Amino acid sequence: MFEVRRLQINYKTLEEFQKFREFGLEELSMKEDLEANIVENDSESPFYGIYDNDLLVARMSLYKIDGKYDRYFQPAQDYYELWKLEVLPDYRSKDYGTALVNHAKSFGAPIKTNSRCRADDFWLKMGFTPVKYNLMRDRGENPYVWLPESVELQD
């Protein structure tokens, strides 16, 4: 199987993210997120990736959200927001995206994401469910959630 690694917040990772910019979709760009983390000197990297040899071929940004901001889960609790996930075009259909999502699930906390780039089928296949849209809470997003046992959706 694939090894999912937490990516360091440094200029080498920024260089690797440039390859995604060349081939990837603008909506999935994580370059600005990484630059902000470098500036803030954030030691807890929210970025995870999979390498094929020495090439970063799949990545995701996964942010831990404090339970006091939880508007999705019952009981209210800390959860993860899987902000973005991307696999380079030549490496798709090889389960790299699945490995990243399973890594996020391994933390055992609920996960919220937004379906981007018409990826609804992928999120459904990964066991996520669409959330009933709430204008005040979702503000134009299309949220999907994954619930571990003993966690339910808020009404």
Swiss-Prot record:
MF terms (GO), sorted A to Z: acyltransferase activity, transferring groups other than amino-acyl groups
Keyword Aminoacyl-tRNA synthetase: no
SUPFAM superfamilies in UniProt: Acyl-CoA N-acyltransferases (Nat) (SSF55729)
InterPro entries listed in its UniProt record: Acyl_CoA_acyltransferase, GNAT_dom, YlbP
Protein EC: 2.3.1.-
Keywords recorded for this protein, A-Z: Acyltransferase, Transferase
Top-level EC class: transferase
Chain ranges of the N-acetyltransferase domain: 7-154
CDD domains with a match to the protein in the record: NAT_SF
Name of the protein in its database record: Uncharacterized N-acetyltransferase BBR47_38600
Organism the protein comes from: Brevibacillus brevis (strain 47 / JCM 6285 / NBRC 100599)
Upper taxonomic lineage: Bacteria, Bacillati, Bacillota, Bacilli, Bacillales
